[in-house]
Design a protein with these regions (language model features):
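Flavin-dependent oxidoreductase catalytic cores
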Residues: 1-345
Length: 345
């Protein structure tokens, strides 16, 4: 079972990956979605999206864009870099992205246009010896099982090797629980058809208990993709790996509890952000991370407000130091592994 970091704008950059790696890392790190057109024009900030630290061999480059030629050229460029492969974003529902013809718009366009995109991008990625994957949703609000599985047929017939399904529709976002049973149906459908595609589940997995629930709802999946929970708890992958009975990459016995230093972990993220991101990105990246990370303490709203109001490296370091100086009992968080390993049905 692969454990995978989901692609998240302003979050899944090298600083977060480095913070996760402190706790043993994960199997695949999807990047922030990279705008194909901007990458090709060589914008001043594009190089910051191309760092592969700390584990280059585990990088999955996710691209987005509404124009086929730019997507193909971006895929060609990224296929020559370190990493597992290239992923097309067909799931983002942000209005600006959809209006540009990118993200989930590819699931809603005239089928022939999307077929052409998949054929051409897949050819350059596989030609470079890299894996070709797609991240998608169920479709629009009026989707049917027939239309969804027909779309999967198209992907499979054009050489997609892995799909990550976020089982919500375009408008559902996080308002309702993900329909995990569709992931299980997708696994069975692919098996019945004999397609050589791995299925990854994405949606509301936060810890070992929710991972176990997801696996029972969707037997046969090849991996679990974790998003926001990895920002709140960069050690979440380690917890789940322990529950799976896997080697966590740590010297400690995987059955033993482990202690997280919340001050040091937060400070580590800030220091890594300074190393891997331009000053122009500090505010958005700090605010985005600490909006989630603050939930680890008792007075989360208080700490979050202080951090979001001081969105500079110096400001965040100071606020973290002051908070834990006033509440030293909250600094060290003991994480206990489950009493038993996953009982997957």
């Amino acid at each position: 079972m692969k454990l995978i970091l989901a692609p998240m704008a302003t979050l899944t950059h090298a600083a977060l990956r480095s913070t996760i790696a402190q706790f043993g890392g994960c199997d695949e790190y999807y990047t922030e979605m990279i705008q194909a057109g901007t990458l090709l024009t060589g914008g001043p900030f594009e190089k910051y999206y191309l760092f592969t630290d700390p584990e280059p061999e585990k990088i999955v480059w996710q691209i987005t864009g509404g124009k086929i030629p730019a997507m193909v050229e971006a895929a060609k460029m990224l296929s020559q870099m370190d990493g597992i492969g290239v992923d097309i974003n067909m799931g983002c529902c942000a209005p600006d992205i959809v209006r540009s013809g990118a993200g989930i718009a590819w699931m809603l366009k005239e089928r022939r246009e999307t077929e052409e995109l998949v054929e051409q991008v897949g050819a350059v990625v596989r030609g470079a010896g890299k894996r070709f994957s797609v991240k998608l949703r169920l479709g629009d609000e009026d989707f049917t099982e027939e239309s969804f599985f027909s779309f999967v047929d198209m992907l499979a017939q054009r050489g997609v090797q892995q799909v990550a399904l976020h089982p919500r529709t375009k408008k559902e976002k996080y308002r309702r629980p993900p329909r995990l049973h569709y992931v299980g149906q997708l696994v069975r459908y692919i098996e019945e058809k004999g397609y050589a595609i791995q299925v990854v589940l994405n949606g509301n997995v936060q810890d070992s208990e929710s991972a176990c629930h997801a696996m029972n709802q969707s037997p046969g999946i090849a991996g679990i993709m974790i998003g926001r929970a990895a920002a709140q708890k960069p050690w979440a992958f380690r917890q789940i790996a322990q529950a799976l009975g896997r080697d966590t990459g740590r010297e400690e016995d995987r059955s033993e509890p482990f202690t997280v230093d919340l001050l040091e972990t937060g400070c580590h993220f800030v220091r890594e952000l300074e190393k891997f991101q331009p000053q122009e990105f500090y505010k958005t990246r700090l605010q985005r991370f600490f909006a989630f990370y603050s939930d680890n303490v008792q007075f989360a709203h208080h700490l979050r407000t202080r951090l979001l109001n001081h969105p500079t490296p110096e400001g965040c370091l100071q606020q973290l130091e002051e908070y834990f100086a006033a509440a030293p009992h909250e600094r060290f968080k003991e994480e206990n592994p489950p009493h038993e390993q996953f009982n997957v049905l």
